[in-house]
Amino acid sequence: MNQEIIRQTPLWAENWPIAYAVVQAVVILLVVVLVAALMSFIERRLLAWWQDRYGPNRVGPGGMFQIVADMLKIMFKEDWTPKFADKLTFRLAPAVAMATAVLSFMVIPVSPALGVADMSIGLLFFMAMAGIAVYAVLFGGWSSNNKYSLLGGLRSAAQTISYEVFLGISLMGVVAIAGSFNLREIVEAQRDVWFIIPQFLGFLIFVVAGVAVTHRHPFDQPEAEQELAEGYHVEYGGMKWGMFFVAEYVNVVLISALIVTLFFGGWLAPFNLEIPFVPPVFWFVIKTAFFVMMFVLARGSLMRPRYDQVMNFGWKICLPLALVNLLVTGAVILMNQA
């Protein structure tokens, strides 16, 4: 693996390692934010296509510049803070949401040589950022001094903390097989077989928990329009609301990238194919784009369950299945070692 990384690293990076690391970080994080912003347009077009509607098609050819119009509209809206809100916490909440979402991408290896940070505890860093992200919605819900915001914040905290338990346990099977929390080593451990095969149950639990943690449909109870009038960010507008909005799409891309990294071989080609002139990052992007589309498809095809049903499903179904998956994985590993 080290030889492959050295072979794909530019020559100037050996003389300027700090500059190379900074360039990687800026490029990857900038691309992530731009893709998250672009997802707004992509989601609307896909939903319109699947529902036999036109979708945004007025601004630019095929509506391509709709995202630019939306960004300009948000940027020029009044940066308003309610008089009855706790101003410091109110302003801090969207920054925390955006920062935790973007920083989580530090540990995602896009290719053998492309990644911001090669941490030995990459998965633990992701879980830590996911835990801190809960404070964003709590701050937003409480500081707004609005009953709907507070209910949305409480819902979000309970739902996120609950499903992060199942999210973490579902990852332990992958960690046990790979023998590492390092995401690069987890990808390299899948050269013979992708972990979707031995960890199919863990994959299903991770997908469900990932959707719940990102508050995407059908687990969008914290911001249910029909029940809570947008929930914890009902008092937000302008760029503050835009930061919450972009952070949600960044989290969608993040969970999709983690699914690819943990269960579908990351940058590895299917069946160990070696196609000339096709870089490893191509496979990573294609796989991630597929799961991003699945997030959008879930929004257009599934109904929203009640909040109590979501919590019951997590604790009564996801938790036992996650524990069974971990127990069986540990037993199989011990049998193979014996």
UniProtKB/Swiss-Prot annotation:
One of its GO terms (cellular component) is plasma membrane. It is an enzyme of class 7 (translocase). Pfam families: NADHdh. GO terms for biological process: aerobic respiration. It is a multi-pass membrane protein. It comes from the Bacteria. It catalyses: a quinone + NADH + 5 H(+)(in) = a quinol + NAD(+) + 4 H(+)(out). The chain crosses the membrane at residues 22-42, 96-116, 121-141, 161-181, 193-213, 249-269, 277-297, 315-335. It is found in: Cell inner membrane. The keyword Methyltransferase does not apply. InterPro entries: NADH_UbQ_OxRdtase_su1/FPO, NADH_UbQ_OxRdtase_su1_CS. GO terms for molecular function: NADH dehydrogenase activity; oxidoreductase activity, acting on NAD(P)H, quinone or similar compound as acceptor; quinone binding. Keywords: Cell inner membrane, Cell membrane, Membrane, NAD, Quinone, Translocase, Transmembrane, Transmembrane helix, Ubiquinone. Its main location: membrane. Its EC number is 7.1.1.-. NDH-1 is composed of 14 different subunits. Subunits NuoA, H, J, K, L, M, N constitute the membrane sector of the complex. Belongs to the complex I subunit 1 family. PANTHER family: NADH DEHYDROGENASE SUBUNIT 1, NADH-UBIQUINONE OXIDOREDUCTASE CHAIN 1. NDH-1 shuttles electrons from NADH, via FMN and iron-sulfur (Fe-S) centers, to quinones in the respiratory chain. The immediate electron acceptor for the enzyme in this species is believed to be ubiquinone. Couples the redox reaction to proton translocation (for every two electrons transferred, four hydrogen ions are translocated across the cytoplasmic membrane), and thus conserves the redox energy in a proton gradient. This subunit may bind ubiquinone. This is NADH-quinone oxidoreductase subunit H. It comes from Acinetobacter baumannii (strain ATCC 17978 / DSM 105126 / CIP 53.77 / LMG 1025 / NCDC KC755 / 5377).
